[in-house]
């Protein structure tokens, strides 16, 4: 989350795993940002496919998830290397809960994508709270942004439009080119460089605020349960 040329109120690493960073520096002016991230998103899908062999590939997860409207109570916490938000807890672990004999493969696929989307929504919440701003849309790039199913779930859980840019898998390369070329080499400003981007698709929220709040509350409860479990082991209860 870019926050301008003033140093954000929280510097270094905050209590919730949010980082205050210098995003870029041009013309001797620093531009700051707040950053949170989910350590295992695409890598979680690869782990599920390559190590557990539950699905052939990540594309199959997305395709199966698109065939159902919900996970029917199944939740996936993608904390394969711990949690950063809402609390920095490296000892937290991934979990797949709420499974019954009636659970289908498609519902597990949906839960996996929903777990990633919930985690990203937590990051958005943390950034907005610290910066004291309200984001109007989420612009996405990278490999996972190729999943329409994931981006629709993300829009529903974050309550804001999700905009996928053209050639989103080249987002990092495009950002480097914008920074390198926006000092007069190719463009006069970063804003001028950004104006050249082309939108591939926009995913609008389809869930109402009540349904969104219920889903988010259920997810927060699952995260808090895992944090309590990790804390108990930290205190020696698991010995």
What label would you give each PLM region?
Residues 1-141, 146-239:
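Active-site core segments that coordinate phosphate-bearing ligands/cofactors
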């Amino acid at each position: 989350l870019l926050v301008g040329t003033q140093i954000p109120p929280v510097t270094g690493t905050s209590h919730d795993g949010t980082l205050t960073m210098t995003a870029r520096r041009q013309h001797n002016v620093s531009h700051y940002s707040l950053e949170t991230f989910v350590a295992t998103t695409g890598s979680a899908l690869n782990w599920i496919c390559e190590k557990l062999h539950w699905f052939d590939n990540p594309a199959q997860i997305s395709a199966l998830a698109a065939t159902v409207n919900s996970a029917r109570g199944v939740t996936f916490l993608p904390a394969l290397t711990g949690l950063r938000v809402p609390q920095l807890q490296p000892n937290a672990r991934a979990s797949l809960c709420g499974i019954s004999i009636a659970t289908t493969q498609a519902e597990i696929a949906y839960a996996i994508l929903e777990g990633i989307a919930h985690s990203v929504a937590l990051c958005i919440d943390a950034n907005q709270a610290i910066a004291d701003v309200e984001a109007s849309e989420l612009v996405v790039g990278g490999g996972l942004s190729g999943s329409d199913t994931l981006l629709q779930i993300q829009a529903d859980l974050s309550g804001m439009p999700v905009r996928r840019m053209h050639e989103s898998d080249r987002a990092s390369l495009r950002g480097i080119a914008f920074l390198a070329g926006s000092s007069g080499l190719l463009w006069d400003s970063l804003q001028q460089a950004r104006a050249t981007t082309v939108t591939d698709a926009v995913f609008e929220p389809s869930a109402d605020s009540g349904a969104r709040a219920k889903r988010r509350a259920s997810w927060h409860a699952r995260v808090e349960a895992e944090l309590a479990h990790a804390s108990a082991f930290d205190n020696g209860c698991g010995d």
